[in-house]
Amino acid sequence: MKKIGIIGGTFDPPHYGHLLIANEVYHTLELDEVWFLPNQIPPHKRNRNVTSAEDRRKMLELAIEKEGYFSLCLEELEREGPSYTYDTMLQLTKKHPDTTFYFIIGGDMVEYLPKWYNIEKLLELVTFVGVARPGYTLQTPYKILTIEIPEFAVSSSLLRERYKNKKTCKYLLPEQVQSYIERNGLYES
């Protein structure tokens, strides 16, 4: 059986925090790969303007290009409508029956698990891996694996705000992602 970690998100933009989480879980659980799963329309962020799927895909490709065990999974970007993890994982488990999936989530999402669409059935498809995040406990009524990682308190919303206010983002996200953002004028207003 292959062991694949999945880290889902908007990745608007992807940053070193995402890469750190993926790398730590990869090594701790001795995974074969980690797939980055950018979502089309996250159900919990429907009212927020999200950078285009194409720009987010390109930034994510740039962010993970140097790591052989990181891959891009476009399952949700290629599907219209809201991105429900249950629907995605149902498709992926059918396509990859020889794989055990570990779905990686931050502490903020661990607390939100009871509200996830079809959570009981989703728990039959994946093992959730909760990663500690500042300000959140890993409390949930569900059985999950928990992993402590070095704290890196950066978020995509912080980066968007810094770009909007013309502050430096150096050392917070990969240089090639930073160049892409600047070249394409993302997050300027």
UniProtKB/Swiss-Prot annotation:
SUPFAM superfamilies: Nucleotidylyl transferase (SSF52374). Keywords: ATP-binding, NAD, Nucleotide-binding, Nucleotidyltransferase, Pyridine nucleotide biosynthesis, Transferase. InterPro entries: Cyt_trans-like, NadD/NMNAT, Rossmann-like_a/b/a_fold. Its EC number is 2.7.7.18. Catalyzes the reversible adenylation of nicotinate mononucleotide (NaMN) to nicotinic acid adenine dinucleotide (NaAD). NCBIfam families: cyt_tran_rel, nicotinate (nicotinamide) nucleotide adenylyltransferase, PRK00071.1-3, PRK00071.1-4. This is Probable nicotinate-nucleotide adenylyltransferase. It comes from Bacillus cytotoxicus (strain DSM 22905 / CIP 110041 / 391-98 / NVH 391-98).
